[in-house]
């Protein structure tokens, strides 16, 4: 029995099916590293192991990240992007302390899938000042955008201090969070509350000093700026004296 011909309209259209977004190879590599870090010592994880776990050729891995330290920097970026994807608009009218509390908790939520690996890596990092310094640069860049997303100034005279303070606050809270397995995270939130109080007191004093020394800074700028015109006036006066004894030809 002959089959009826299939109508062109009834044939499946591959283009109509929604295409899944391509996997981010950088995220694949970071997640592979964190899986390995959860079960192995940091110094036992080779680059070839990471490439195999991530399912990428070693040559591609080299193009994505030059080192394991750079992969940790990649984790900082992934977490930062996740926090920025959220919204802090509902906290816009809240005090700075509440906005910081929200940022830290959302950052910890974004770090939660990598907690097992971070727990093993953290002691190694703490023993290496150069690694701490390198990771601090990435954390500063990440927190600059975190604070900006919460409406906290980062580009004024004290902006750099606020950003670095947020990085240090996050580091101190993370020490407790890594060992806090309670669903409510009561120990973590208690530590965060204490650190926010301390940071608030420090920033209040710094802002007071900055405000009180504003007249002195203004005077110093006026003195520094005032020297240059005097030098220029003196140079012009000397030039005039020289010109009095010279016979200049008319311009051609």
Task: Please place each PLM-identified region on the residue numbering.
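Inter-helical turn/loop segments and adjacent helix faces that build the functional surface
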Residues: 152-157, 176-186
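Helix-turn-helix
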Residues: 2-4, 36-74
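C-terminal peripheral helix-coil segments that are non-catalytic and often amphipathic
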Residues: 2-9, 179-252
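Hydrophobic alpha-helical connector segments
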Residues: 74, 88-123, 127, 137-138
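Basic, helix-initiating cap at the start of DNA-binding domains
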Residues: 2-36, 40, 48-49
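Amphipathic alpha-helical packing segments from all-alpha helical-bundle domains
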Residues: 129-152, 160-174, 190, 198-200
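Amphipathic alpha-helical interaction segments
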Residues: 28, 49, 102, 120, ...
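Alpha-helical DNA-contacting segments of helix-turn-helix folds
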Residues: 37, 69-79, 83, 121, ...
